[in-house]
């Protein structure tokens, strides 16, 4: 897709021209912050800057914490307590880092569901969407390994349970599990590997974020109407857009300030609200916690993992058809990763010609059921695997897959969308009036 017509950077002084011919960094920054942006973006589009800020915050606080952290099973727990008690500002760094992970996932879930509602995954933005899903997977891996580092009870047993999932893969599973752990069980080699990867992966995420931004700068931003910016001429493009600076930067910074106000209130007044008290007990391989619960942002997919127990008919059927190769444990692993994979396949599963859910009445109903379903999965993921939570998680998991694999494809063929505006300018003027009037 050709870019949106707009003014590009033109060096004016001799020094600017000299630098631009050799390293056009000024031009790159100019074209990035002055990019034409659909003028009708609403407040759901502010979470991108929250994610960018939080990523930088996590990297900076993580580097500071790593200075005093010791990745050894005999010293890790004590080194975290040393950071909390003896290092100047150490408690603040740890609480900001721990709660920053929650803010990061909250923002990314809102970002994902906004994309699902407004059709930001549809052509020509498939690459942007897929790169975003890869970033999300790396976030999950990074957060999981980071949760292991304090070496509390939940850290140790969470690592034991999650790494055990790889052992469920037929044939090669035990070898993969041993390779991940560095031995037969979670121990010092595991902690060292997780610390190393936890330090590395945020920089990989940052690189993918740059690609993500590059991708949507190439195709142009989506917007609440799903209508593309007119590219026929610069004059038409200017009627549909505003430069990112200063209009959207100021708006985003204002929203970021409000989000950070709430974030630092949590850090200051209830920093352990989203944590688990068992993680303030040093890891003990001989004492299993009564109820192993991951961090809240893993709960929806943890619920899907546990939903398909051995007595569920589809698990029994698949187990029989595969002669026991795909048992209940492996089926749960497939379901958990499949729940993420179907989101990545949304560009091809959604057959509607209309992008935005704002003009799709039936889609809106099913979408809000999906949001409710996600909340229910988060809730049951924290509950024990007993009646009625097991049945609720199974029903909620079934709807998750049904939405992407059945409902989205059928809606494209059966739904009659509402009329969409001819241009972004028309939509903007219908809400805010014509500036020329």
Swiss-Prot record:
Q: What is its main location?
A: membrane
| Cofactor binding summary note | Binds 2 heme b groups non-covalently.
A GO cellular component annotated for this chain's UniProt record is:
plasma membrane
Question: Where does the record say this protein resides?
Answer: Cell membrane
Q: Which CDD domains match?
A: cytochrome_b_C, Cytochrome_b_N
**Which ranges does the record mark as transmembrane?**
45-65, 100-120, 129-149, 156-176, 194-214, 248-268, 298-318, 330-350, 365-385, 391-411
Annotated heme b b562 binding sites? 97, 198
Provide the membrane topology annotation: Multi-pass membrane protein
Q: Which GO terms describe its molecular function?
A: metal ion binding; ubiquinol-cytochrome-c reductase activity
Record-annotated residues binding heme b b566?
111, 212
Q: Which UniProt keywords apply?
A: Cell membrane, Electron transport, Heme, Iron, Membrane, Metal-binding, Respiratory chain, Transmembrane, Transmembrane helix, Transport
* Superkingdom of source: Bacteria
Q: Does the keyword Metal-binding apply?
A: yes
Gene Ontology biological process terms, A to Z: respiratory electron transport chain
Note on file?
A: Heme 1 (or BL or b562) is low-potential and absorbs at about 562 nm, and heme 2 (or BH or b566) is high-potential and absorbs at about 566 nm.
Q: How does it assemble?
A: The main subunits of complex b-c1 are: cytochrome b, cytochrome c1 and the Rieske protein.
As for what it does, the entry says: Component of the ubiquinol-cytochrome c reductase complex (complex III or cytochrome b-c1 complex), which is a respiratory chain that generates an electrochemical potential coupled to ATP synthesis.
Question: What is this protein's record name?
Answer: Cytochrome b
Lineage, broadest ranks: Bacteria, Pseudomonadati, Pseudomonadota, Alphaproteobacteria, Rhodobacterales
């Amino acid at each position: 897709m050709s870019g949106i017509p707009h003014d590009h950077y033109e060096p004016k002084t001799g020094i600017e021209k000299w630098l631009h011919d050799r390293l056009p960094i000024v031009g790159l920054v100019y074209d990035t912050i002055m990019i034409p942006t659909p003028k009708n973006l609403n407040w759901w589009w502010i979470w991108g800057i929250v994610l960018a800020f939080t990523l930088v915050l996590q990297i900076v606080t993580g580097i500071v914490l790593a200075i005093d952290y010791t990745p050894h099973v005999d010293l890790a727990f004590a080194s975290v307590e040393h950071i909390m008690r003896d290092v100047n500002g150490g408690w603040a760094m740890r609480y900001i880092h721990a709660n920053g992970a929650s803010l990061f996932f909250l923002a990314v879930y809102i970002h994902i569901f906004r994309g699902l509602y407004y059709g930001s995954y549809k052509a020509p933005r498939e690459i942007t969407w897929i790169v975003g899903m890869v970033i999300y997977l790396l976030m999950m891996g990074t957060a999981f390994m980071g949760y292991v580092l304090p070496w509390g009870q939940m850290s140790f047993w969470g690592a034991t349970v999650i790494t055990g999932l790889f052992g469920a893969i037929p044939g090669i599973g035990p070898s993969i599990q041993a390779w991940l752990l560095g031995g037969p069980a979670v121990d010092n080699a595991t902690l060292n590997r997780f610390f190393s990867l936890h330090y590395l992966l945020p920089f990989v995420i940052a690189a993918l974020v740059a690609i993500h931004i590059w991708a949507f700068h190439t195709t142009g931003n989506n917007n609440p109407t799903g209508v593309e910016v007119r590219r026929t001429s610069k004059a038409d493009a200017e009627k549909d857009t505003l430069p990112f600076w200063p209009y959207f930067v100021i708006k985003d910074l204002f929203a970021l300030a409000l989000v950070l106000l709430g974030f630092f209130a949590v850090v200051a007044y209830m920093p352990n609200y989203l944590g688990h008290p068992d993680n303030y007990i040093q890891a003990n391989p001989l004492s299993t916690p009564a109820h192993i619960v991951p961090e809240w942002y893993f709960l929806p997919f943890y619920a899907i993992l546990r939903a398909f127990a051995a007595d569920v008919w589809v698990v029994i059927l698949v187990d029989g058809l595969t002669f026991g190769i795909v048992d209940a444990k492996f089926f749960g692993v497939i379901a958990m990763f499949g729940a993420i994979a179907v989101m990545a396949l949304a560009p091809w599963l959604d057959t509607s010609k209309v992008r935005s859910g704002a003009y799709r009445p039936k889609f809106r109903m099913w979408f809000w059921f999906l949001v409710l379903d996600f909340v229910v999965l988060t809730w049951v993921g924290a509950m024990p695997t007993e009646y009625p939570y097991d049945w609720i998680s199974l029903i909620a998991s079934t709807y998750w897959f049904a939405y992407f694999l059945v409902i989205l494809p059928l809606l494209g063929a059966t739904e009659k969308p509402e009329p969409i505006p001819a241009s972004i300018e028309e939509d903007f003027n219908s809400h805010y009036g014509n500036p020329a009037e």
